[in-house]
Amino acid sequence: MGKVYFVRHGQSLWNVENKICGATDIPLTETGHRQAIETGEKIRALGIQADEILYSPLQRAADTARRIAEITGLPAREEPRLTEQNFGVWESTPRDGAEFRRAKENFCCSYGGGESMLRVAQRIYNLLDELRAQPDRTCILVAHNGIARVVKSYFSDMTNSEYAAFGVKNCEVLEFSFDGKAE
């Protein structure tokens, strides 16, 4: 049965500044570039076998994926559905703002010109369904924290508060199996 590995991009400038990045195209910091290299080395050292790396077109994820691909020798291609959620009016605002936290409780909210969590889930679930239909295939997805939440929710039931609280560190590697078990 196929697997999916998920890697969150390396540290970005707005991660350091504690700002909501969302669909805004913010670059990696030098630390982020180092994290990407270390993650590629970790994937190679662990002997993770994958057919392909799929990555978000936003530069922080694309640069992370390219570094991993260079080190592992795996083919990599852009997958637009892995773009981070557009948080509309909240982009570039403090990540820990109380108003934003309340806004996230409404999964149908498009954040004043952004994208609702339900729309994000639709595109990510469609991608994962396509990958699941290829049972002998394993992919590494390189994307964003918001996308990590949706991927996790595909493989595991979560309450709304668990979903909102779930987070992945920069360049953390998660493993999911289509046999129904998150590892």
Stretches found by the model and what they are:
Residues 55-56, 122, 142-143:
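Short beta-strand scaffold positions
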Residues 8, 78, 143-144:
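A secondary-structure boundary/capping signal
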Residues 16-19, 65, 88-92, 154:
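Short aromatic-enriched loop/helix-cap "lid" or pocket-rim segments at secondary-structure transitions
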Residues 70, 125-182:
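Active-site-adjacent alpha-helix immediately C-terminal to a catalytic or transition-state-stabilizing loop
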Residues 68-125:
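Phosphate-handling substructures
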Residues 2, 7, 11-74, 115:
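Active-site-proximal alpha-helix that buttresses catalytic centers in soluble enzyme cores
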Residues 25, 58, 83, 144-145:
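Short beta->alpha junction loops/turns
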Residues 16, 22-24, 78-86, 107, ...:
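Glycine-rich, flexible loop/turn motifs
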